[in-house]
Design a protein with these regions (language model features):
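Sec-dependent N-terminal signal peptides
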Residues: 4-13
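Sec/Tat signal peptide C-region and signal peptidase I cleavage site
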Residues: 15-19
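Transmembrane beta-barrel domains of Gram-negative outer membranes and organellar outer membranes
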Residues: 22-28, 32-77, 81, 85-89
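Transmembrane beta-strands of outer-membrane beta-barrel pores
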Residues: 25-31, 55-59, 90-96, 123-129, ...
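Residues that define the transmembrane beta-barrel architecture of outer-membrane proteins
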Residues: 32-36, 63-69, 98-104, 137-143, ...
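Residues on the lipid-exposed face of transmembrane beta-strands in outer-membrane beta-barrel proteins
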Residues: 38-42, 71-75, 104-110, 123-125, ...
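Short loop/turn motifs that connect adjacent beta-strands in outer-membrane beta-barrel proteins
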Residues: 46-48, 76-87, 111-120, 150-160, ...
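Outer-membrane beta-barrel transmembrane domain signature
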Residues: 131-225, 248-250
Length: 250
């Protein structure tokens, strides 16, 4: 799951530019596969729209095996007032391995005077529609923090961005290789964070759209990833998954 464009998008929207699109290709060292991510943001006078789509490419399969999508709308038709940093937020996310979810809430955006440092907080009600796993007494809330810093430590073209999600869950962990109906353990909270570091290497050869970098996916009891359909146990507890890749800004 990626939200790296979100803060850049907020900056772009605030500066009057209408849209931004990028594509990323990452190699996941833990899972041993490539992930293609497409991100898009569009700002308007009523707020902004953001989406991304992750597509997983296991090397032992001839076609992409799994996908995950998030699309969100920030509603803010009071831009230019003292309440401009505060927006309403509505979001849908899901995929062919993940449960569909609707989220409703608010977000608050902070930034430096030149928008080179950005931070947003979101608090949302989350409604999960589970298909494979079951829900048992969960708190239907999600807290999200997203950040972005341009020219990190004074290095031109070095960007540090990422997000942290914490949400209530009622997942009953099962092992489909043994018995899909056998409940093993219930988790009530899930955490996912993906700090990213990108360097605009293309600035050195007249190709400013190209960046090189990567991310570290840090999670707790997160069932995401194409391998979740074969082994739910793999992501129980705390896990770290480093990734390396390229990004192209259109």
């Amino acid at each position: 799951m990626k939200k790296g464009l979100f803060f850049v998008a907020l900056m772009i929207g605030a500066m009057g530019v209408k849209a931004q699109v990028n594509i990323q290709e990452m190699y996941d060292f833990n899972r041993g596969h490539l992930t293609t991510t497409l991100e898009m943001f569009k700002g308007d006078k009523w707020g902004s729209t953001f989406f991304f789509n992750d597509i997983y490419h296991p090397f032992d399969m001839n076609v992409p095996s799994e996908y995950y999508t998030e699309i969100s709308r920030a509603i803010n038709f009071w831009q230019g007032t003292k309440l401009a940093p505060l927006s309403l937020h509505v979001e849908w996310n899901g995929g062919n391995f993940a449960s569909n979810s609707w989220l409703f809430g608010v977000e608050y955006f902070l930034h430096s005077s030149d928008y080179s440092k950005r931070l947003t907080f979101q608090l949302m009600y989350k409604e999960i529609s589970h298909i494979v796993v079951h829900l048992v007494d969960y708190i239907p809330l999600q807290f999200t923090m997203v950040w972005g810093v341009d020219n990190l430590m004074g290095v031109k073209g070095l960007q540090f961005s990422g997000f942290l999600d914490v949400w209530g869950s009622g997942d009953t962990w099962v092992n489909p290789l043994v018995d899909p109906t056998d409940p093993v353990e219930t988790t009530h909270w899930v955490m996912l964070a993906e700090p990213q570091l990108w360097y605009n290497i293309g600035q050195h050869f007249n190709c400013g759209q190209l960046s090189i970098g990567g991310e570290v996916e840090m999670s707790y009891n997160f069932t995401g990833g194409w391998h979740a359909t074969t082994n739910f146990y793999e992501n129980k507890g705390f896990n770290v998954a480093p990734c390396l890749g390229l990004k192209w800004n259109f």
